[in-house]
């Protein structure tokens, strides 16, 4: 009974505690044990590991190579040191700079540059240092372009002497343009058969005079000097003169002026057309004097067949000297015999 009363008193005092009867070691004795209330369990979340960066390099695929180029450790250390010395952003920029510096030696050793075959398909960006992946063009390319530009004006024989051109037809140092005779040097090239070729410049005789080739080219394609006077007295279109200047200078080279005259209307062209004074022009020595005058009256004085084809063009500043020139021209056209009126 006492134990039961004690149980009731304990229940009244401790309302929240749970009483669990337990049998002691001795029979007949009962002990009460209190258990703590249930505690909420906290879940500990493990810290997530950061995502792994891909080890694949960002690169542009090139034929025959992978992502990396294997090199000795000493060479890699030198490239790394040079990158710091030149203050480049990457080692690849330093290697690109080294290739550009060694381009002349590479061309001398291999005959070609370091431009890959698939250069057109690569997406190459210009770096901040201004370096590019382009190799300098070979000397034969520049010589070929210069020859094409000079051949239009007929001066190719002055740029390249025939004795300096190699006689080996199979050599690749000069392009095909130099190994074959130019069209301007042989006027009979069009009359030949398609299978036949003109003689090569290297096969010419050593004692050939280069002046003959120059004179033949000048006689074949004479330079033309353009004169466009605009007389204020005329209301219609003025004449545009093309004066041929040949190398011989004789009267046989003078052609009909009507063949080199074109008419144009100055009203369609805004601005003022000033006349040009050709003071002294010596064809043989390529000497030319130019002067600009304010007046539009032009007088033409042509010298004789001597003096190497000298042609003088003068400007008249007044109207009266021009009439005198026209009087001289009419006298030349209508010669008088001595003693006749």
Swiss-Prot record:
Which stretches does the entry tag as region Disordered?
1-59, 183-218, 313-341
UniProt key word DNA-binding: yes
Q: Name one GO cellular component term.
A: nucleus
Composition-biased stretches, type Basic residues, lie in: 50-59
In the UniProt record, does the keyword Nucleus occur? yes
Q: Which PROSITE patterns match?
A: TCP
Where, subcellularly, is it found? Nucleus
Q: Which GO terms describe its molecular function?
A: DNA-binding transcription factor activity; identical protein binding; transcription cis-regulatory region binding
Q: Where is the composition biased (Polar residues)?
A: 332-341
One GO process term, biological-process aspect: regulation of DNA-templated transcription
List the biased-composition ranges (Low complexity). Answer: 1-12, 33-49
Q: Which UniProt keywords apply?
A: DNA-binding, Nucleus, Transcription, Transcription regulation
In this chain the TCP domain maps to 55-109
Q: Which domain of life is it from?
A: Eukaryota
Assembly with partners or alone? Interacts with SPL.
Quote the PANTHER family the UniProt record gives: TRANSCRIPTION FACTOR TCP22-RELATED, TRANSCRIPTION FACTOR TCP4-RELATED
Q: What is this protein called?
A: Transcription factor TCP23
> Which organism was this protein described from?
Arabidopsis thaliana
Q: What is the lineage of its organism?
A: Eukaryota, Viridiplantae, Streptophyta, Embryophyta, Tracheophyta
The gene that this protein is the product of is TCP23
């Amino acid at each position: 009974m006492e134990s039961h009363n004690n149980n009731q008193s304990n229940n009244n005092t401790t309302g929240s505690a749970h009483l669990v009867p337990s049998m002691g070691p001795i029979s007949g004795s009962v002990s009460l044990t209190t258990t703590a209330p249930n505690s909420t369990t906290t879940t500990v979340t493990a810290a997530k590991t950061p995502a792994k960066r891909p080890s694949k390099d960002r690169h542009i695929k090139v034929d025959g190579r992978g992502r990396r180029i294997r090199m000795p450790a000493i060479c890699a250390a030198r490239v790394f040191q040079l990158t710091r010395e030149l203050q480049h952003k990457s080692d690849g920029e330093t290697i690109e700079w080294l290739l550009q510096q060694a381009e002349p030696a590479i061309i001398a050793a291999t005959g070609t540059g370091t431009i890959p075959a698939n250069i057109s398909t690569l997406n190459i960006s210009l770096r901040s240092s201004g370096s590019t992946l382009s190799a300098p063009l070979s000397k034969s390319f520049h010589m070929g372009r210069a020859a094409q530009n000079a051949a239009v004006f007929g001066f190719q024989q002055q740029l390249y002497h025939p004795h300096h051109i190699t006689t080996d037809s199979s050599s690749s140092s000069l392009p095909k343009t130099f190994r074959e005779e130019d069209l301007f040097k042989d006027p009979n090239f069009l009359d030949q058969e398609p299978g036949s070729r003109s003689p090569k410049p290297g096969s010419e005789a050593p004692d050939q005079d280069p002046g003959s080739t120059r004179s033949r080219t000048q006689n074949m394609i004479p330079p033309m000097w353009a004169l466009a006077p605009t007389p204020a007295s005329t209301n219609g279109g003025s004449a545009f003169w093309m004066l041929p200047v040949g190398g011989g200078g004789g009267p046989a080279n003078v052609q009909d002026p009507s063949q080199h005259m074109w008419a144009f209307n100055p009203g369609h062209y805004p601005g003022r057309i000033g006349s040009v004074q050709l003071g002294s022009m010596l064809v043989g020595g390529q000497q030319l004097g130019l002067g600009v005058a304010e007046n539009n009256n032009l007088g033409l004085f042509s010298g004789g067949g001597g003096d190497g084809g000298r042609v003088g063009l003068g400007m008249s500043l007044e109207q009266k000297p021009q009439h005198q020139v026209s009087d001289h021209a009419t006298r030349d056209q209508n010669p008088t015999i001595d003693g006749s009126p």
